[in-house]
């Protein structure tokens, strides 16, 4: 029984080259030190005397800087090697966190948050561009899944350690987070001093030089990705409120429900992505979005810890289908010369939702109630299912006439 399971894991990871593994390792180092942002609101309110709304503005300013940073990072990747963009983003972010920990005045912190978002979020499209260049088209989705595995392992470690450090002194959060950013940048420069391994098979689109701004299916997918992210980011805002208010769960139990998401991704995402590799990825992204919405739409119909876990399992399966596959779809849609811009715009669709999702979600939660919010997420899931099926049909017609 154990042998087939081990064989499935070997198959899921097989074929990924050295560059993909090293990029994912750098991500793991970086995410293992992620401590500042998860605790920033608490730090600003508790230590610096910010009002809750002012702390929210600071987070929003980071997101606003991140929108520009995502596009800039992708744009730069079409002009210089992505590894330089990644290393530069990490190094500047590391210095930025060290400086932020020394600031106390409101205006200086607001300015610092914009700049941190600008330099920090360029890391995402640059990493995606580097992964796409390193992996052949048929392995790109698995390369993105491996990077997501590194993110989830790191994020399960960093914030938990950060909580203990914060009890001693918040200063340690800025030191450790900044230090791991600098360490990851140094690791990349050393590991890739001779350049990255590039796949021999690159161009996968019939229009390799086409601008993303004239790519109809991609622009529609941008809107759908934004809707997907609006639903997704409820996990970091109103999901916890619902488990507290409607389910009566305490912080520890809420943390366990959240942990189900990470555990399932770490254990099964690579295998799942490998198993569905022969199916239409655009249609699967739509199915993933539907399951995301369905898992959230289940919430008003239960009130127990076990039911919350079941709902988390459903939307986690949706996440495992939609997130790595969507990155692969965008990477394969682009040509070599403009993949950075494509990945930058793809990242912007999520960065934009990061700004609006908590505002919209909490407003609906307070004004119309949690049931309306979660059933609304279910409706969005249906829109995503239908929308991505329509885009898939559009792309198939496009290929036939190319």
Locate predicted features:
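Juxtamembrane intracellular "pre-TM" segments in multi-pass secondary transporters
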Residues: 1-17, 193-223
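Helix-loop boundary and gating motifs at the non-cytosolic
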Residues: 13-63, 219-224, 229-257
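Residue-level signature of mid-helix packing/kink "hotspots" within the transmembrane helices
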Residues: 35, 63-67, 71, 155-156, ...
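Helix-to-loop junctions at the C-terminal end of transmembrane segments
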Residues: 69-81, 268-281
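Structural signature of the two symmetry-related core transmembrane helices
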Residues: 84-98, 283-297
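Helix-loop junctions at membrane interfaces in 12-TM secondary transporters
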Residues: 101-112, 300-311
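Cytoplasmic helix-loop-helix junction between adjacent transmembrane helices
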Residues: 113-153
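Symmetry-related core transmembrane helices of the 12-TM Major Facilitator Superfamily/SLC fold
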Residues: 174-189, 374-389
């Amino acid at each position: 029984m154990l042998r087939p399971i081990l064989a499935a894991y070997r198959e899921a990871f097989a074929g990924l080259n050295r560059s993909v593994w090293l990029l994912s390792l750098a991500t793991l180092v970086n995410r293992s030190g992620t401590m500042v942002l998860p605790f920033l609101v608490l730090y600003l309110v508790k230590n610096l005397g910010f009002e809750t709304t002012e702390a929210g503005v600071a987070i929003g300013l980071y997101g606003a800087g991140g929108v520009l940073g995502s596009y800039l990072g992708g744009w730069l990747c079409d002009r210089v090697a992505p590894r330089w963009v990644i290393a530069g983003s990490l190094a500047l972010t590391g210095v930025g966190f060290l400086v932020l920990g020394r600031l106390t005045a409101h205006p200086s912190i607001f300015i610092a948050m914009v700049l941190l978002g600008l330099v920090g979020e360029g890391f995402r499209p640059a990493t995606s561009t580097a992964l796409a260049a390193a992996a052949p088209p048929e392995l790109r989705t698995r390369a993105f899944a491996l990077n997501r595995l590194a993110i989830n392992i790191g994020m399960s470690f960093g914030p938990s350690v950060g909580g203990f450090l914060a009890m001693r002194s918040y200063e340690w959060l800025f030191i450790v987070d900044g230090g791991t950013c600098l360490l990851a940048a140094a690791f990349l420069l050393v590991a890739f001093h001779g350049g990255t391994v590039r796949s021999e098979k690159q161009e996968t689109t019939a229009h390799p030089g086409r601008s993303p701004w004239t790519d109809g299916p991609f622009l529609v997918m941008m809107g759908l990705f934004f809707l997907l992210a609006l639903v997704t980011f409820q996990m970091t805002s109103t999901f916890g409120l619902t488990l507290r208010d409607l389910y009566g769960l305490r912080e520890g139990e809420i943390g366990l429900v959240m942990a189900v998401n990470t555990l399932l991704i770490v254990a099964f995402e690579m295998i799942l992505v490998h198993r569905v590799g022969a199916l239409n990825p655009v249609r699967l992204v739509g199915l993933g979005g539907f399951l995301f919405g369905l898992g959230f739409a289940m919430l008003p119909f239960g009130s127990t810890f076990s039911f919350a876990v079941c709902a988390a399992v459903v939307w986690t399966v949706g996440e495992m289908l939609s997130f790595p596959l969507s990155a692969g779809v965008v990477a394969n849609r682009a040509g070599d010369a403009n993949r950075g811009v494509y990945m930058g715009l793809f990242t912007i669709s999520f960065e934009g939702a990061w700004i609006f999702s908590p505002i919209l979600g909490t407003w609906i939660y307070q004004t119309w109630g949690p049931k309306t919010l979660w059933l609304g997420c279910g409706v969005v899931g249906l829109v995503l299912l239908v929308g991505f099926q329509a885009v898939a049909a559009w792309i198939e017609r496009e290929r036939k006439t190319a």
